[in-house]
């Protein structure tokens, strides 16, 4: 859990909020600092991170015990899932995922696909998992090898393939 909080950037905010709670008294500068930090903490959805983390870890097939372990104690697959959890929870303007379904079992893949369809930000996925691309994406952007131009195709991967075959 501490790794996730550190990655998201709320660990430092939490620590400073606790410091200021003990130091504020009637110091207006510290009260203002506390308000600013709390606003940033709220913007990062810090109060909901424990709940969201539990949901994401469970969805990716990890149990709650993993939160108490250090990263170096985890297997390679567990580390990848924890990193994916951190990326999903960070909250960005654009989510970029490279082979997100690697090392996931079918249940976790289904959960991830559902999660990706529900989030409210654009997602760029690089993947060889054609089924997931069919289930998640709503447009394909191809980089033309010769011109280096981006070509946009509406629909999922299967629709893109059909269009390319008709060309």
Report the location of each language-model feature.
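ABC ATP-binding cassette signature C-motif
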Residues: 1-167
């Amino acid at each position: 859990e501490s790794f996730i909080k550190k990655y998201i950037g709320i660990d430092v905010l939490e620590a400073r909020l606790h410091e200021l709670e003990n130091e504020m008294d009637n110091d207006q500068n510290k009260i203002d600092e506390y308000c600013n930090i709390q606003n940033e903490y709220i913007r990062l959805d810090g109060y909901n991170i424990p709940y969201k983390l539990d949901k994401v870890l469970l969805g990716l097939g990890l149990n709650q015990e993993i939160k108490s372990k250090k990263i170096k104690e985890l297997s390679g697959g567990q580390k990848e899932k924890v990193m994916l959890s951190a990326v999903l929870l960070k909250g960005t303007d654009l989510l970029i995922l490279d082979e997100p379904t690697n090392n996931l079992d079918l249940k976790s893949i289904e959960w991830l696909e559902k999660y990706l369809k529900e989030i409210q930000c654009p997602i760029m996925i690089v993947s060889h998992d054609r089924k997931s691309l069919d289930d998640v994406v709503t447009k394909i952007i191809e980089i033309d090898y010769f011109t280096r131009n981006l070509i946009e195709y509406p629909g999922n991967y299967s629709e893109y393939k059909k269009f390319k075959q008709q060309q």
